[in-house]
A protein has these predicted regions:
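Short polar/acidic secondary-structure junctions
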Residues: 21-22, 35, 133, 149-151, ...
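Surface-exposed, glycine-biased beta-strand/turn segments
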Residues: 42-154
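Zn2+-dependent peptidoglycan hydrolase active-site motif and core
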Residues: 139-177, 202-204
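Cationic-aromatic interfacial patches
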Residues: 1-42
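Short, well-structured beta-strand-loop connectors
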Residues: 135-146, 178-193
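Conserved small/polar residues in nucleotide/adenosyl-binding loops
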Residues: 206-214
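Extended, charge-rich intrinsically disordered regulatory tails
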Residues: 188-195, 200, 208
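Terminal peptide-recognition signature
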Residues: 30, 105, 142, 187, ...
Length: 214
């Protein structure tokens, strides 16, 4: 399978998955080659309007971090990137994912945040507001690829690999209850809701990510 010009991993039973860039402006071309026969499919990508969200009153060092923490942020971003880039053969990406916690959706995917009047990168997950200490479930079975207590932006953070480049990220946790390499079943408790990192209140920032993005 080739999506646009990118080869995408296919499972033994014929499943594949890829993600679309938030701001993609053109259709997707999928090329399937089987036993020497090539088929080409075109899928339409619809334009979407995103919410603009303004948040004021944040500590200035969380909006524009001081130069003294640039190295830390860069190192943490590299570790996150490595965990998100894992493209294993785990089969759990095909499962029906569940919500990791019950609560109010206070931030939506794709929204543009303006923090203290300064436009920032778009939001690539959803914020689920819940009481501090609320138990968080794994939304699907998988293997823990990152478990950190105190990242600069996302605080307590867990990343889980579900196979074929699909990962889930759980951020702003009060407590992290798993370790790298742990094999987790869907619904297992992995941590608790907190307000760590750059957060305006107790919530879970929940992100589903695809390593194969076009």
């Amino acid at each position: 399978i080739i999506v646009d010009k990118k080869t995408v991993k296919v499972s033994e039973d014929g499943y594949f998955v890829f993600g679309l860039d938030r701001d993609r402006k053109f259709d997707v071309t999928i090329t399937k080659t089987l036993n020497g026969k090539k088929e080409i499919f075109t899928k339409k990508v619809l334009k979407r309007k995103y919410r603009i969200q303004r948040i004021d009153g944040l500590p200035e060092n969380k909006v524009t971090p001081p130069e003294s923490v640039y190295k830390r942020i860069r190192e943490e971003n590299n570790k996150i990137g490595e965990a998100r880039a894992i493209n294993s053969n785990l089969p759990f990406f095909k499962d029906q994912f569940i919500m990791p916690v019950e609560g109010i959706i206070s931030g939506v995917y794709g929204s543009q945040r303006i923090l203290n009047g300064k436009p920032k990168w778009p939001h690539y997950g959803i914020d689920i507001a819940a009481k501090k200490g609320t138990m968080i479930k794994s939304s699907a079975s998988g293997i823990v690829t990152m478990a950190e207590d105190d990242l600069y932006y996302t605080g307590g953070t867990i990343i889980m690999d579900h196979g074929h480049g699909i990962s889930t990220i759980y951020s702003h946790l009060q407590s992290v209850m798993v370790s790298v390499g742990d094999k987790i079943n869907q619904g297992d408790i992995i941590g608790t809701v907190g307000s760590t990192g750059r957060s305006t209140g107790p919530c879970l920032l929940y992100t589903s990510d695809a390593a194969d993005e076009v």
